[in-house]
Amino acid sequence: MALNTGIRYNYASDWGVWEGVREFVQNAQDAHEDGHKATYELKNNCLIISNKNVVIPSAALLLGYSVNGRSARGRHGDGLKTGMLALVRAGHAVEIYNGENKWTPEIEAAEEYGGERVLVVNQRKLRVTRTDFTVVIHNIGEGVWAALRARFLFLDKPIDFETLTSSIGTVLLAPSYEGCLFVKGIFVAKIKDLAAGYDFNDMDLDRDRRVVDSWSLRYKLNEVWQSLVQQHGDILYRQLRKSDSSHELHGLSNYADSGLAKRLQQELIKE
């Protein structure tokens, strides 16, 4: 049985392997935090992502359909479908084991759409129903997975003494994270003139997980440092000293309150 998603071959044409894997991993992590244990395994050049006791409806193949809430990483409802498309388009076969069915996404010409190439999910009934939702992504080598894995902080955790954590998010102080922006543990972008790396607990992103505007970024930077400055003003001061054009410094000039200004003044006097 073929389930035609109606999604054209070139939809989200700038998505590739990273975006495809990201969507499956973020969905798995959301389910993990809801009590459905996630596992990640690389075996015979296949990345295998599983969640315990999960079955999703076929309606999940419709654009805009989502079971995720506001607090989840994937909010726009398109990740499953667009992730499939990106991976298959890039030459990575995908198999999904979902309850009593096996889904195999492919790109095919659709007669009902005048021969347009679209994403089709071929559905086959399994002999034995599975309780775990499992995604198998083919042609993922060790080097590729190592590079991708490093973009998920919940899979490749930073060293504790190289981080500062608050209710707003985490500052990543290791040089390897400089300029790296994460949201809920998933890499978003490498940003010029960031003196450190950051993992925010929440931030408005678009469908492609891009920062909506620079103002939001600067506001978040100020929020996280406001929450940390009393205990770690010396570290903030060192970060600001790295560059006179950093986003941290720009945000500070716009949003710093008197307490933050006083704490930094104390560090300046020490110097």
Feature locations, PLM:
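Short beta-strand/loop element within the Bergerat-fold HATPase_c
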Residues: K37-N45
